Structure formats: C-alpha cells, structure tokens
C-alpha cells in the first residue's frame, strides 16, 4: 500500500521531526509512505472571513495538485468521523482488500481545509473534538497508521 501524508506548512520543531521519522521508519516494513508539505499561504494575524476563505482556497489548490485521481483521500478535520484504533485498522485493511492501494491523508493549515479539499475527500477522520497543532497531528496520524498495521497483523503493541 502506498500512503501519502499531505500537510500545509513546513515542519520546524525538531522533536516532532524525530517522532515522525521514527514512525515512518517503522512503517517502512508495512507500506510505502511519503510525506508532502505544501507551502502555507502567508497571511496577517487578523483576517476577514473572505480573506480566510481565500487563504484556504490557495492552500487547497496546492493540496489538490498533489492528489491523483485514483487515490483514496482522508481529510483530517475536527468535524470528521471518529473511530477507535481497531476500526481504523479494519478500514485500512478493507481498502487494501478492495484494491485501493493509494491512500492520502490530508492535514490542513491553521485555518483548516478548503471546501474543495473536503469535497475531494472520500472520507473524513477526527482524532478528537479538541484542536491540535497541525504539525503535532502529523505525528499522531503516523502513530495511528503504525498501530493499525500492528493490529491487522496481530502483532503486539502497547495499548
């Protein structure tokens, strides 16, 4: 399976880079994983609603340019569908069974995802009703993908 994680903005924090690198290294035994960072749109602190939509639209265009037509897309969003780790593992296994070999997970910037990206998504996923920095979310996602593979192979992993 080929998994792509698309994020808005460049990851700067060393501790997050190290955590993500560890999980992507572990995932190499199970799948092909690729990370794509699209540039975030520079914007002032205070934005009108119209300016916010414009920023999300530009970031969304950059995201959509990285997604092929045969890719199953998950959009990460607070309002997305929540799952247990076991349910997530079952979903990934089912996608592989039905021949969906390319999966992309999309993490938006600080303003969230553009409506166009949400429309392109085949499904949404939420890890919590809480708000997390999008850079931290990338590491949490990598851990959950790794956990899913361990669950699907009946391999031990901390609960």
UniProtKB/Swiss-Prot annotation:
Alphabetically ordered keywords of this record: Cytoplasm, Methyltransferase, rRNA processing, S-adenosyl-L-methionine, Transferase
Binding site for S-adenosyl-L-methionine: 76, 108, 127-132
The EC number(s) this enzyme carries: 2.1.1.177
Function noted in UniProt: Specifically methylates the pseudouridine at position 1915 (m3Psi1915) in 23S rRNA.
Lineage, highest ranks first: Bacteria, Bacillati, Bacillota, Bacilli, Bacillales
SUPFAM superfamilies, alphabetized: alpha/beta knot
Localization of this protein: Cytoplasm
Main location: cytoplasm
PANTHER family named in the record: METHYLTRANSFERASE (PTHR33603), RIBOSOMAL RNA LARGE SUBUNIT METHYLTRANSFERASE H (PTHR33603:SF1)
Assembly, per entry: Homodimer.
Gene that this sequence comes from: rlmH
GO cellular component: cytoplasm
Family: Belongs to the RNA methyltransferase RlmH family.
Source organism of this protein record: Exiguobacterium sibiricum (strain DSM 17290 / CCUG 55495 / CIP 109462 / JCM 13490 / 255-15)
Name the record gives this protein: Ribosomal RNA large subunit methyltransferase H
Pfam family, one: SPOUT_MTase
């Amino acid at each position: 399976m080929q998994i792509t994680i698309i994020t808005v903005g460049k990851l700067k924090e060393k501790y997050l880079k190290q955590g993500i690198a560890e999980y992507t290294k572990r995932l190499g035994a199970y799948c092909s994983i690729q990370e794509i960072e699209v540039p975030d749109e520079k914007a002032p602190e205070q934005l009108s609603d119209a300016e916010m939509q414009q920023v999300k639209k530009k970031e969304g265009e950059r995201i959509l340019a990285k997604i092929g037509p045969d890719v199953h897309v998950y959009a990460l969003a607070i309002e997305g569908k929540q799952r247990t780790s076991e349910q997530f593992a079952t979903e990934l296994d089912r996608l592989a069974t039905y021949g969906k070999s390319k999966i992309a997970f999309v993490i938006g910037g600080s303003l969230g995802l553009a409506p166009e990206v949400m429309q392109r998504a085949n499904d949404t996923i939420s890890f919590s009703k809480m708000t997390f920095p999008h850079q931290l979310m990338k590491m949490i996602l990598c851990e959950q993908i790794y956990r899913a593979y361990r669950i699907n192979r009946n391999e031990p992993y901390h609960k």
